[in-house]
């Protein structure tokens, strides 16, 4: 079942967590305190997690205006009913995700395993996200550049930890041309065209960029140097899933060099905040900011900062990382600078990036069993307008009058910077159009027929549900549409934030967490588990083997809570508060 609510979310909300704990709150903004502290964990169905880790408010059923021959609910309320061909989240969450991607027309399979085709709608989502993020990256002082796709294999071996981290994922180029076989039987690598040094198809660009930094940085006057690039990378994956894990993916990677350690670390933390703000403001997705454990940090980094998001099934999704690289790459590539005292010093470094994985996070955070649900801030089309007409061939005068009315509405919305699409497929039944746009997640659907035009209104349906409502085409029409979009954006964030709080648990013993996760294996729910932890790589590996849960991070705002507490696994004095979860 999809969560439904009236906008905006008001007093009297109830949030039920995956462990069966129900909170009644006066307002969603109150749900910003400490996570629930659970002593006895209950086994409950996974379906409860998907349904109840959301905010709901009592509402009357929508009034429907029937459309003869329509499908997908006719002119009924938005976001209602089940999606044909979409597996429910309760039945199979993984298949549901695949089905929603297909129904939303986001990707298609290519003949190359692990390399998906991102279709126009999927690319439009990435473009919206990229444009917003690029503005914030530029404001941080970074400049865009582009570096080669191919990296000499010797570069990768300059930083020992880095090569260990990526060696098994690298695609290698060994020849620079092909030759035709006899009798037209195809082509093969030309044995006379073997490269003197093999090239790596970039899995990430630290080595190439630091080689270039060694040429560009000479003096303290050259610092800080902040470079960003938008590119594709290749990491050979055996198990792939659209957007979440693919062999080739699109991303943004930033690389900076600084005169001091403090300045570099401050930059890494600043970019983590940028990523978290984009997730909140654009994707309507709350995240937990933290440090990775030593076993999970980026290869070649001193510290890795991460943002972790909670998906509807209680699993975590790493949504962005920012790395404090220390002087490791500066040493490997000899990047020195002359300071103000004419002394030579090594620079300090960071790197940071997010990828098209954020599109997958968006889909998993908000979508339902009908299809996509898109936050207005990132939706390629924020409004779809469906004129109810038989087309210009029948009753041309009435059609022309209707389309003039539609154009006035379009102009009013465009003046308010609303992204709008008018569906003029008049040979298609309106109900089929409604169903299609629901599956594609457009935040607001507007319908206008003769009755609406006579009343000077457009009939609106929110993708997130609730009663349909008329909106008068007057001087404030554009502003009212913007207000509705803002309310939808906020409601989606409030729902996701409520889920995060309701599905985050503090436990004091390993048995509690293990029992809860074992319950999820037989149909129960998962979640985030905050635990006191003593750093121990072997214990971390053992827990992963037994439960499939890993340390997602050490939350930055919880590390002061270790005093006087013992590790939930070993009983030794706690060194951190760790967040464990199963993860995509």
Roles of regions detected by a PLM:
Residues 1-41:
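N-terminal chloroplast transit peptides
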């Amino acid at each position: 079942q999809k969560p439904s609510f009236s906008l905006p979310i008001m007093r009297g909300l109830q949030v039920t967590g995956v462990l069966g704990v129900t909170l009644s709150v006066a307002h969603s903004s109150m749900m910003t305190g400490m996570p629930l502290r659970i002593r006895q964990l209950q086994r409950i169905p996974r379906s409860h997690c998907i349904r109840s880790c959301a905010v709901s408010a009592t509402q009357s059923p929508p009034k429907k205006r029937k459309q003869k021959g329509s499908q997908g609910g006719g002119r009924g309320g938005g976001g209602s009913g089940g999606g044909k061909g979409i597996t429910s989240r309760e039945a199979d969450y993984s298949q549901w995700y695949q089905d929603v991607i297909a129904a939303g027309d986001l990707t298609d399979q290519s003949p190359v395993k692990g390399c998906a085709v991102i279709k126009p709608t999927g690319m439009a989502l990435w473009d919206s996200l990229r444009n917003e993020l690029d503005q914030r990256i530029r404001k941080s002082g970074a400049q865009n550049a582009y570096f080669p796709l191919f990296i000499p294999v010797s570069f990768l071996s300059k930083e020992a930890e880095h090569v260990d981290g990526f060696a098994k994922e690298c695609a290698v180029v060994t020849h620079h041309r092909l030759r035709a076989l006899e009798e037209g039987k195809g082509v093969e690598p030309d044995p006379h065209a073997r490269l003197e040094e093999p090239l790596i198809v970039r899995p990430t660009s630290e080595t190439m960029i630091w080689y270039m930094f060694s040429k560009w940085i000479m003096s303290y006057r050259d610092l800080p140097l902040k470079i960003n690039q938008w590119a594709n990378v290749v990491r050979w994956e055996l198990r792939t899933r659209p957007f979440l894990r693919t062999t080739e993916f699109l991303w943004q990677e930033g690389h900076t060099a600084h005169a001091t350690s403090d300045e570099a670390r401050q930059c890494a933390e600043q970019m983590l905040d940028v990523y978290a703000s984009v997730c909140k403001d654009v994707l309507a997705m709350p995240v937990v900011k933290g440090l990775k454990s030593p076993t999970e940090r980026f290869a070649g980094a001193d510290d890795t900062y991460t943002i972790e998001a909670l998906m509807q099934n209680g699993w975590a999704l790493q949504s962005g990382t920012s790395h404090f690289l220390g002087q490791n790459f500066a040493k490997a590539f000899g990047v020195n600078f002359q300071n103000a005292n004419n002394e030579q010093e090594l620079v300090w470094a960071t790197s940071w990036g997010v990828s098209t994985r954020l599109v997958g996070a968006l889909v998993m955070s908000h979508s339902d069993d009908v299809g996509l649900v898109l936050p207005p801030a990132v939706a390629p089309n924020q409004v779809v307008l469906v004129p109810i007409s038989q087309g210009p061939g029948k009753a041309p005068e009435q059609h022309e009058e209707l389309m003039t009315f539609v154009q006035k509405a379009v102009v009013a919305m465009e003046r308010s910077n609303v992204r709008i699409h008018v569906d003029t497929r008049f040979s298609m039944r309106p109900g089929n159009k409604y169903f299609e746009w629901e599956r594609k997640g457009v935040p607001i659907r507007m319908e206008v027929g003769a009755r609406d035009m006579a009343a000077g209104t457009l009939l609106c349906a929110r993708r997130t549900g609730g009663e349909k409502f008329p909106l008068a085409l007057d001087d404030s029409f554009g502003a009212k549409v913007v207000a509705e979009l803002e309310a939808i954006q906020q409601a989606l964030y409030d729902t996701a934030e409520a889920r995060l709080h309701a599905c985050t648990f503090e436990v004091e013993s390993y048995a509690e967490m293990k029992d809860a996760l074992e319950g999820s294996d037989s149909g129960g729910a998962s979640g985030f588990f905050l635990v006191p932890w003593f750093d121990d790589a072997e214990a971390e590996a053992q827990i992963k083997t037994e439960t499939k849960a890993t340390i997602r991070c050490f939350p930055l705002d919880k590390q002061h809570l270790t005093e006087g507490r013992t590790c939930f696994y070993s009983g030794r004095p706690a060194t951190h508060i760790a967040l464990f979860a199963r993860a995509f």
